[in-house]
């Protein structure tokens, strides 16, 4: 779990996301409160529940990006799901309990990776012995030591070996009919529990054998029960769920029809967000202290179209404003992995140096604003479309222009997209 202060979290998010200070502050405080809760007296700890957040803002302003960056910062089990993927219990589709099951899988993966790091040296030694067994046969001989030296020097990397590895795939998945709350079951996992796990012969090179062997040997050294318990505790107390597209399951007051699935999904989300116990194959998980961050554009529906009970369970509301022309310009240049830098890095692999003048950046931002205003406002995503159109010809001929420096100026941008941006009908289909 991260121990960044709210100010540090915001400054970290500033490296990748332009603007939206209020939203950044809200998620930073919510994240810091997880850390604070662990330090309050035990009798009060269970009473401190997370304050769930609702991010409201038009498409392409950075709601999902905030969640993605927060996940990397949090060092906690994180799951991003689209609310539209779920249906109410009894209908075909995934039910919302699957969110918690997926969160537990994420926590297990985190804990397993951390614990594997602790036994890596022993696992590597055991993997080396198994590779030597495959190369020379078991037993300690002079030939084995000779092979060991060659193996460590990398001389045997391309040599093919035959290994017995645990059979992890190919079991097939199926869903129990008539059991709406049941998860999808993996047949190979069921067989493993009956027969103690099957092995399968794999033919691979020495260099390709290292990763699966180290993973298998690490798992033998780990206490699986303790690992599972730690993962469940981590998911319960530090888990974060980002519910995207929540507005798509809100029933607009003007909309007719049955809307069986929309309202049903909201009703199913209520106990999950409020706090319930979900059974998983690793054991029961309480959702009382899982932080939920919901987001939606709310173009058609309004936040008030959500069920009142669900609105009450998302007490912190943050509105993200639409992006201005200055914001779009900053997005092109300020974030660490900005779009222009990405294009420059891609073309540099071909030996082409791409340079954008300040006027060219202004022209791209102006074109994005114009097309967003005349066609459909998709926010910063419009920049990707326009930049792709601008560098399309350069990318196509880059392989033949190694060693060249290509300067993109305002005239070049106008020549590539000027007519398209001006013509609303063409923009609708091309930009």
From Swiss-Prot:
Gene3D superfamilies given in the database record: 1.10.8.60, DNA helicase RuvA subunit, C-terminal domain, P-loop containing nucleotide triphosphate hydrolases
A Pfam family the protein falls into: ClpB_D2-small
Cellular component, GO annotation: HslUV protease complex
InterPro entries: AAA+_ATPase, ATP-dep_Clp_protease_ClpX, ATPase_AAA_core, Clp_ATPase_C, HslU, P-loop_NTPase
Predominant localisation class: cytoplasm
Localization per Swiss-Prot or TrEMBL: Cytoplasm
Coiled-coil residue spans: none
SMART domains, A to Z: AAA, ClpB_D2-small
Ligand binding (ATP): 18, 60-65, 244, 309, 381
MF-aspect GO terms: ATP binding; ATP hydrolysis activity; peptidase activity; proteasome-activating activity
Keyword terms of this UniProt record: ATP-binding, Chaperone, Cytoplasm, Nucleotide-binding, Stress response
BP GO annotations: protein unfolding; proteolysis involved in protein catabolic process
PANTHER family: ATP-DEPENDENT CLP PROTEASE ATP-BINDING SUBUNIT CLPX-LIKE, MITOCHONDRIAL-RELATED (PTHR48102), ATP-DEPENDENT PROTEASE ATPASE SUBUNIT HSLU (PTHR48102:SF3)
Function in brief: ATPase subunit of a proteasome-like degradation complex; this subunit has chaperone activity. The binding of ATP and its subsequent hydrolysis by HslU are essential for unfolding of protein substrates subsequently hydrolyzed by HslV. HslU recognizes the N-terminal part of its protein substrates and unfolds these before they are guided to HslV for hydrolysis.
Family note: Belongs to the ClpX chaperone family. HslU subfamily.
Subunit comment: A double ring-shaped homohexamer of HslV is capped on each side by a ring-shaped HslU homohexamer. The assembly of the HslU/HslV complex is dependent on binding of ATP.
Designated name of the protein: ATP-dependent protease ATPase subunit HslU
């Amino acid at each position: 779990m991260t121990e960044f202060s709210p100010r540090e979290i915001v400054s970290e998010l500033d490296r990748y996301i332009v603007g939206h200070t209020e939203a950044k502050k809200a998620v930073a405080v919510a994240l810091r409160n997880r850390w604070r809760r662990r330090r309050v007296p035990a009798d009060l700890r269970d009473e401190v529940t997370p304050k769930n957040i609702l991010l409201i803002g038009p498409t392409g302003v950075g709601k999902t990006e905030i969640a993605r960056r927060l996940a990397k910062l949090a060092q906690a089990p994180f799951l991003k799901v689209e609310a539209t993927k779920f249906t109410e219990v009894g209908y075909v589709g995934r039910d919302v309990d699957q969110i918690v099951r997926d969160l537990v899988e994420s926590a297990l993966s985190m804990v397993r990776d951390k614990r594997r790091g602790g036994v890596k040296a022993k696992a590597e030694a055991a993997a080396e012995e198994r590779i030597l067994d495959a190369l020379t046969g078991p037993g300690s001989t002079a030939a084995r030591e000779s092979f060991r030296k060659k193996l460590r020097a990398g001389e045997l990397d391309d040599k093919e070996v035959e290994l017995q590895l645990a059979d992890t795939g190919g079991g097939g998945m199926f869903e129990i009919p008539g059991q709406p709350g049941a998860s999808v079951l993996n047949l190979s996992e069921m067989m493993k529990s009956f027969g103690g796990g099957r092995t399968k012969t794999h033919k691979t090179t020495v260099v390709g054998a290292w990763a699966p062997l180290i993973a298998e040997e690490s798992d033998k050294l780990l206490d699986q029960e303790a690992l599972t318990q730690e993962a469940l505790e981590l998911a319960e107390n530090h888990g974060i769920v980002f519910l995207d597209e929540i507005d798509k399951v809100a029933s607009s007051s003007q909309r007719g029809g049955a809307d069986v699935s929309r309202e049903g999904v909201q009703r199913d989300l209520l106990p999950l967000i409020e706090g319930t116990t979900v059974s998983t194959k690793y054991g029961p998980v309480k959702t009382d202290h899982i932080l939920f961050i919901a987001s939606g554009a709310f173009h058609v529906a309004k936040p008030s179209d959500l069920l009142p009970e669900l609105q009450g369970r998302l007490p912190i509301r943050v509105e993200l404003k639409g992006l201005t022309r200055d914001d779009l310009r900053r997005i092109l240049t300020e974030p660490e992995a900005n779009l222009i830098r990405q294009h420059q890095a891609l073309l540099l692999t071909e030996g082409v140096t791409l340079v954008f003048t300040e006027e060219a950046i202004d022209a791209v931002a102006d074109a994005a604003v114009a097309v967003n205003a005349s066609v459909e406002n998709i926010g910063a995503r419009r920049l990707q479309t326009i930049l792709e159109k601008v560098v399309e010809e350069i990318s196509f001929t880059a392989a033949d222009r190694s060693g060249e420096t290509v300067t993109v100026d305002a005239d070049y941008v106008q020549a590539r997209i000027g007519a398209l941006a001006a013509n609303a009908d063409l923009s609708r289909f091309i930009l």
